[in-house]
Amino acid sequence: VVSWMAIIAGYVQHGQPEEALYCFHIMQLDDGVSPDAITFVYALKSCANIKDICKGRELHNQIKRNSLQHDLLVCTGLVDMYAKCGFLAKAKEVFDEIHTQDVVLWTSLIEGYLEHGYYEEVLDSFNRMQLEGVSLDTFTFMCGLKSCGNMATAKQGLQIHARIQCKGFLEVDPIIGNVLVDMYAKCGQVMNMAERAFDSLPSRDVISWTTLIGGYVDQRCSKEAIKCFEQMQLEGILPNHVTFMYILKACENTWVIRKGQKVHAQIEGMGLSERKPFIGNVLIDMYAKSGLLARSREVFENLHVRDVVSWTTLIIGYYEYGDDEEALNCFNAMQMEGVSPNTHTMVCILRTCGSMVDLGKGLEIHTHMEKKGWLDNDVAVGTALLDMFLKCGLLPEAHNIFSTLH
């Protein structure tokens, strides 16, 4: 079993979970080897990685038959598997059956809650861990901070921050400092608490700077974001593609477009546009929002790959600056190139038709949407269609759409 376990572990560690599960099957079928606790753990990890709940349940039943359901390592693997597959009630059920709950078991449950957006459950579990005297590690603290950020609960985030400082984790793990800055920024505290947390970091890497810049941008503090971007480079920190994405968003106003153009030149100099195609979409958006539609179109034409986001960003730019005809031309060209529209594309084009009172094109799009089932699945598209019919004076059709929406 040791040899088989080593092979299975190797596959798991090198990101090949299907091969690991195949070996687990062959080990028993051909060689008649019964898996031990560690082998089960690797098999469960494979199921978690590919979210194969059916195989995971089979393993759970086999674990019970082998009387390993009370083994702490195996149970941690089960909790992790169920949590990653989205079966959080089952993960909690397995968790509650264990008498000795260590930090690893708790963290498996908490990580599952966090991944699936159960932020209150993360914080409840975090508090319960402390009440039960379980020693928290840096990862558990980070899960707590991320939940506070996503729920915008700065008060509890401040309490977690105090505990992190007491344990001295900021000095030993730079990642937790970045998560701390992000938490305060998401709570809307970027101009005070996020800045203070950032300034107190023992060392600041590109992620630290980018997190603070992102916080400024999200709070519409463009001047502060640009100042921070310039300072990080003065300190010898090279921006990454995420930093550039944020700073381009900060330059989406006419008063800072010159800075945006300089950043664009810097991006081209680093060859980032080719390596990170989404940067091109952000550039299209920046120029469009600054009213430089010719420049926006130029960036668009130079893209090696034009996806639905590229097309939609350009279409929205034309619509917002009143060039309805060009917005429709782009929409037609997009379809000619075989790019399928998304919700944002359809909403914008319907608004364009309403603005132009172009009933013919609007009805054509309506027919297309009915065939694709858009009206059944998307309230935003239905609402835009309703608005278009009203602007075109088609009250019976508008009433029918209204009835469908409600």
Label the model's feature ranges:
Residues 31-32, 67, 98, 102, ...:
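Inter-helix linker motif
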Residues 4-5, 9, 20, 36-41, ...:
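Pentatricopeptide repeat
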